[in-house]
Amino acid sequence: MVLLSLWLIAAALVEVRTSADGQAGNEEMVQIDLPIKRYREYELVTPVSTNLEGRYLSHTLSASHKKRSARDVSSNPEQLFFNITAFGKDFHLRLKPNTQLVAPGAVVEWHETSLVPGNITDPINNHQPGSATYRIRRTEPLQTNCAYVGDIVDIPGTSVAISNCDGLAGMIKSDNEEYFIEPLERGKQMEEEKGRIHVVYKRSAVEQAPIDMSKDFHYRESDLEGLDDLGTVYGNIHQQLNETMRRRRHAGENDYNIEVLLGVDDSVVRFHGKEHVQNYLLTLMNIVNEIYHDESLGVHINVVLVRMIMLGYAKSISLIERGNPSRSLENVCRWASQQQRSDLNHSEHHDHAIFLTRQDFGPAGMQGYAPVTGMCHPVRSCTLNHEDGFSSAFVVAHETGHVLGMEHDGQGNRCGDETAMGSVMAPLVQAAFHRYHWSRCSGQELKRYIHSYDCLLDDPFDHDWPKLPELPGINYSMDEQCRFDFGVGYKMCTAFRTFDPCKQLWCSHPDNPYFCKTKKGPPLDGTECAAGKWCYKGHCMWKNANQQKQDGNWGSWTKFGSCSRTCGTGVRFRTRQCNNPMPINGGQDCPGVNFEYQLCNTEECQKHFEDFRAQQCQQRNSHFEYQNTKHHWLPYEHPDPKKRCHLYCQSKETGDVAYMKQLVHDGTHCSYKDPYSICVRGECVKVGCDKEIGSNKVEDKCGVCGGDNSHCRTVKGTFTRTPRKLGYLKMFDIPPGARHVLIQEDEASPHILAIKNQATGHYILNGKGEEAKSRTFIDLGVEWDYNIEDDIESLHTDGPLHDPVIVLIIPQENDTRSSLTYKYIIHEDSVPTINSNNVIQEELDTFEWALKSWSQCSKPCGGGFQYTKYGCRRKSDNKMVHRSFCEANKKPKPIRRMCNIQECTHPLWVAEEWEHCTKTCGSSGYQLRTVRCLQPLLDGTNRSVHSKYCMGDRPESRRPCNRVPCPAQWKTGPWSECSVTCGEGTEVRQVLCRAGDHCDGEKPESVRACQLPPCNDEPCLGDKSIFCQMEVLARYCSIPGYNKLCCESCSKRSSTLPPPYLLEAAETHDDVISNPSDLPRSLVMPTSLVPYHSETPAKKMSLSSISSVGGPNAYAAFRPNSKPDGANLRQRSAQQAGSKTVRLVTVPSSPPTKRVHLSSASQMAAASFFAASDSIGASSQARTSKKDGKIIDNRRPTRSSTLER
């Protein structure tokens, strides 16, 4: 192996025969040896083909030649293995075909240009008559059998993208560096059997100036304004996209395919040679595809070639304008859009165009140019890239990243810290880093836009997936289903005939046809059960070709079941069935899951701690045999996280691990390293320390949920003893709750370390009869790591310890000292007492001021300043804590630095859309809009500045609108109350036209009928009292109760005077001013005659005096400002009588202790009558009334009111 220096230059032999027109002809012969002078450090190697174990098979490498090699025999033809030794390392490559790089039907087109002198450099007119034209010279399928991807055997995190079309060529990404490999000479496939020399060089060793990518993209669509005339060309395509759905096969979830048109100009073809350029480009795109498969991206994207076009000389120079990258990109995008297949389902329809050239289209160092977020756009989904070897794959990936929506790291995002580590979207590509990756910002920006790129959802590859029948039993007879259920030979039982063979499937074996078996299940739906019939839902039914599909729908949830554990966090479930309705005839099943779960019994177990997983393993001790022997089974945590919810146990006797062929019980902890996440139906469910599903809360070092270690204390010490006799010798105790426990010997000794559970007496480590050997085991619900190295023992566990443990030694020699050092972390409330055993409490954590961040720049442009922000950091774990932990007088002074030094742009007036008009007509309508003075920034955003910085007049922000006369409208008042108290009546309202007789439409009605409850039609059986004939009482006929009592007398009177005392019901019972004991007994109405309802609150009334029938001591209640004339009283009494909320009482003018008496003897007699008629107790001097649960004693003085006499 020879390490060549920078000065070693390989000879380059080029022989080109050109045609008369200056172009390369068909007979062109090109041999180009690699320009290895560009590489500062490289090695010449001879790769070999090997098998999986790395054993030599042959020197044959190329795909076209491997078929002829008799020695190239592999047990798996889908894999290839090669050995390469370079830079002191052995690379055992494991490769598989990259079947996702070239789409089916992909082609290579060779374009030829016919020229008219003088016009070949005009990139705009090259399609005019008499100018340059081109035609397809030939088309051939794009070869797909020599692109491979893979990794390096036994080295995790590596990737390889290599082609073996002509030797090995491509990229090897190891654990700490990236290498390129390619054959030293091309076209030597037939000479490989003797060994073929290749060049391997580091990517960081490619000699080139730093590549400035800071100006390699367009921000806005207007930057490609020269393509506006393509709007007409692609109008039909947009219409087709909107009116029809693409019928291409849909890719899987989170799987995206960029179907690429690869355009290659003549400069690239000439440099690599027509015979080799296709293989080179295939290798280059294989590397690009692998870059997009890096797991740091977070999204799986395939770069798929659907078409490759090799351009002729004239077309190539017409597209690229030297020194004008914007115009060159415009020409390339125009050309790519013109190559698009109009049929969306065409196999060559592309999503994105990549153009490669070796011409200088921009200033020195510019390697690419692309628009941002142009993916899937018919014009803007394209990139212009300078091809310069395999390292150009990173330029292509970088520019395509812009089209996908990614921006430069550190420009407009906070990922500038990742550029020095080799991020793909770094603005300055120096090729001096070791491993590429996608920054976190690139992943976030991609995920922000990727879901809007519908064109990437197509799957260009054919999949031979069989179409499943709508009913599963169509393809399987009952005999076949019997064979599946019970084994070879079983068929449907014919010993007895069932009424319906679809109820249950019975099977028997020909050796014993009368012995029938069943699994108590029906045959599959669709199983033929008779001629023209099939089984469906347990019934033999006639086949109906026109059966309509019925999608399923979920039924209701059941109640939650019992908890899987009585303590220590269990799980309970509830379920639902897809039966509302059930899916039939191929209908869709119900979406979503059929069960839900929640945590239950999350409190810790009160009794002695027991490991739930260990209990499940112990239950197998009595009946589970492994290798024909019973074992004592201990819990075992599988290293594969996907299998930690499967029950694996470890034999205490042999150490063998056995799978118990079942899942762990729901509520079992997934891992001993995570005390909260649990297994639910075989899946690990993340649970935080707050015992909430999906929570990210974690414990600090001493078990405080969401803590910051401020309550944690570290206890450490050294204990030395010299044994005088054999037998276990106690050294010290470790209390429960201890975490991060470390016990180790200070020096080699013959003694053996042992651990004992103080609560149970069980030996955790090195009990009697056990062999002391290094191992990792589980006990006391935690994982222990016991290690013996050079006769020095150590024991570690993360804990926490659920029980106290005793640390002992097993002496092997007398009078030999044993010295143990221990250290653990515990909560400050559980710190043990410090004694003379040399146990000390470690000092509290120390803190320091550390740079936290930089402040926001004082100016967005034109040169501003930003200052350092310091925070308080704990030294033990470098975690930022509250600033109060650090000494304020030691805080460093802020450091200032310049920022945003780019020149500011001129602010502009920006007016937003007008708001809606405030009126639809009239003379006062106006509308507003927001007008701001904005300054465009270089990152594409704007900032608002003071209006004084904007030039020109400020656009108006308010203007009149809809200033037209409003049409005249009819105005209507409220409807009056019904004219009657029962039966049919009328309501009236006022209708006016403010514009005379010029109102639009018909005049609204001013009178309408009203319907009240039917009047009382009970037959009148005559007056029930002789007092009914008294004229002085005739005014009470309007009261329903009195009218019923004196129906004969009231019916004889044509008109009835209003009652002298009225009071509408108040909003609360206390608003009714009443005291039956203070009223004339002749005027107290029986409550039973006047129903009281609380359904409709009535309006309050004020009291005023009135001189009318009833005497000077009579009072009536009226609405404020109402007229107390007889008509009003008559109308009010009628309304009061028909109201459901009215209660009639009297209000005296004299103080409550006096009684008011009528002046006639007849009225005195009437008082006696009414008192006797109050069967419910209205004459009682103490009455109670219930309303809203309150008891009111009417003997107490009433609420004060203003009374006028």
From Swiss-Prot:
Disordered: region residues: 1174-1205
Residues bearing glycans: 83, 119, 242, 345, 475, 814, 942
Subcellular location: Secreted; Secreted, Extracellular space, Extracellular matrix
Identification of the protein by name: A disintegrin and metalloproteinase with thrombospondin motifs 3
Domain Disintegrin: 470-550
Organism: Homo sapiens (Human)
Substitution effect: residue 291 to T: In HKLLS3; affects proteolytic maturation and impairs secretion
Cofactor dependency: Zn(2+)
Record propeptide residues: 21-249
Catalytic residue list: 399
Positions with a binding annotation for Zn(2+): 398, 402, 408
Domain Peptidase M12B: 256-460
Short name of one Pfam family: Pep_M12B_propep
